[in-house]
A protein has these predicted regions:
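Alpha-helical recognition segments enriched in aromatics with Gly/Pro capping
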Residues: 1-32, 47, 119-328
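Short phosphate-binding/catalytic loops that engage adenosine nucleotides
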Residues: 58, 132, 454
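Structural preference for alpha-helix termini/caps and helix-kink/transition segments
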Residues: 267, 274-468
Length: 468
């Protein structure tokens, strides 16, 4: 299995740090509004990478954070006359709902930046101790960028070229030593959330959050760090500088980045009126269509979103789902008998489609070619199944198809709705977990219910739930 490593600018054979295990960190959204379709691309792409790794037998520890303290969240809270915590909590719930509708699996861990402040203070203290950071007179802590000799290795930028492009960055009133130094900790402002620290009451900079959460949940060294290509510089470059200076080892072996999503060949922006949330797309299409559309191009290729392309994705998905429904229908009335000689030959032939699928995915997760292999399997199925097919033959083809679709996150059979009693039992377990302050288990149960389309609402009277 080969993947393209942004760090080396070439495809490399994937060799995990520990045999059979993958430690993967994906930068998650800043939760101040409903997620937009640009946010959805990395969610779907790297969920599919994870699914294929699991298909290949790897145990994947998948961590994806929520940035729940940020200028945009604070601005939204001020506009609404509420707290930053209330805004982020609400939109985390909404984000998880959208993720479930796109069939994005919950991460092994979804850490929140605000729950990891102590770790951030510890890492900043270590960087100061090692001479990689310094506190200014006003309590702001900066990273001493030039001290990290490998700065620019991910974005392939020369630090002197960066300096030339940032001559005006050191504005009046800033107390940093160098124009390229970036913020690790910033002093509080009136009305903003803040935490006590050795330098001042304040809050962390954005970059330190991911370095700390990755270290806590995955360790000093990880296999894969991923996100959108807009994060390569400065966010991921700064993460490397922080983590490698603090921990003394290479931060991530492989770096993966997805390309941008454009709308009708234009960059998505609110000012152009071509800005769409996942929720808005969900009003017109099943979000399985959005997922299928996102996987119809290679993740490193720019993807153009348009009504025509979404209709094409809808039609393509329907071809697959219809073939699956046809097999299920035939299987209900099929004769229970041994495979015929012809059926055995056909099943042997059908393995070529799985091989083609795996070859595509082994080549830097080429989902476009993998989908092509699924379509070939669908055509093969439509040609060779009939009312005379044996149950064993139909089951084998269905299982093959489902196995490939599961990797892509394409649902070809709707799960039966959970019974009310099952839901109530899980809610009771969640309440008990919260009483015991086992918030991780409580969040896991909320995620399980979200995946099943059950939305919880905590009220003074207790927990209310409804089906999505």
């Amino acid at each position: 299995m080969k993947l393209y490593n942004t760090l080396t600018k070439q495809k490399e054979e994937f060799v995990p740090l520990e045999e059979g295990k993958v430690k993967m960190y994906v930068c998650g959204p800043t939760v101040y509004n409903y997620i937009h379709i640009g946010n959805a691309r990395p969610m779907i792409v790297f969920d599919t990478v994870r699914r294929y790794m699991e298909y290949k037998g790897y145990d994947v520890n998948y961590v994806s954070n929520f940035t729940d303290v940020d200028d945009k969240i604070i601005k939204k809270a001020i506009e609404e006359g509420t707290s930053a915590e209330e805004v982020s909590k609400r939109f985390i719930t909404e984000c998880k709902k959208d993720m479930a509708d796109m069939n994005v699996k919950p991460a092994t861990t979804h850490p929140l930046a605000t729950q990891e402040i102590d770790g951030m203070i510890d890492m900043i203290s270590k960087l100061i101790e090692k001479g990689y950071a310094y506190a200014a007179e006003d309590g702001t802590v900066y990273y001493r960028t030039r001290k990290f000799k490998d700065y620019g290795k991910l974005s392939h930028k020369n630090i002197d070229d960066l300096q030339a492009g940032h001559r005006d960055i050191k504005v009046t009133g800033e107390l940093k030593e160098d124009a390229l130094d970036f913020v690790l900790w910033k002093p509080k402002k009136e009305g903003e959330p803040y935490w006590k620290s050795p330098w001042c009451d304040g809050r962390p900079g954005w970059h330190i959050e991911c370095s700390v959460m990755s270290k806590k949940y995955l360790g000093d060294e990880i296999d894969i760090h991923a996100g959108g290509e807009d994060l390569i510089f400065p966010h991921h470059e700064n993460e490397i500088a922080q983590s490698e200076a603090a921990n003394g080892v290479e931060f991530s072996k492989y770096w993966m980045h997805n390309a941008f999503l454009n709308i009708d060949n234009k960059k998505m922006s609110k000012s152009l009126g071509n800005f769409f949330t996942v929720r808005e797309i969900g009003e017109k299409y099943d979000l399985q269509v959005l997922r299928f559309f996102m996987l119809s191009a290679h993740y490193r290729s720019p993807l153009n979103f348009s009504a025509d392309l979404m209709e094409a994705a809808k039609n393509g998905l329907e071809r697959i789902v219809t073939a699956a429904e046809n097999i299920r229908h035939l299987r209900e009335n099929a004769k229970v008998a041994d495979l015929t000689g012809e059926e055995k030959t056909l099943l042997a032939d059908s393995k070529a489609f799985t091989e083609k699928f795996e070859t595509a995915m082994d080549d830097d997760f080429n989902t476009a070619d993998a989908i092509s292999a699924v379509f070939e399997l669908v055509k093969f199925i439509n040609t060779h199944v009939s009312a005379d097919s044996s149950e064993a033959f139909l089951t084998a083809l269905y299982d093959q198809m489902k196995s490939l679709c599961d990797v892509l996150g394409i649902i070809i059979e709707k799960e039966e709705e959970m019974l009310d009693a099952e839901i109530e039992a899980l809610i009771e377990e969640r309440q008990a977990a919260r009483k015991e302050k086992n918030f991780q288990r409580a969040d896991e149960i909320r995620d399980i219910l979200l995946e099943k389309g059950i939305i919880l609402k905590d009220t003074r009277e207790g927990v209310q739930w409804k089906r999505a």
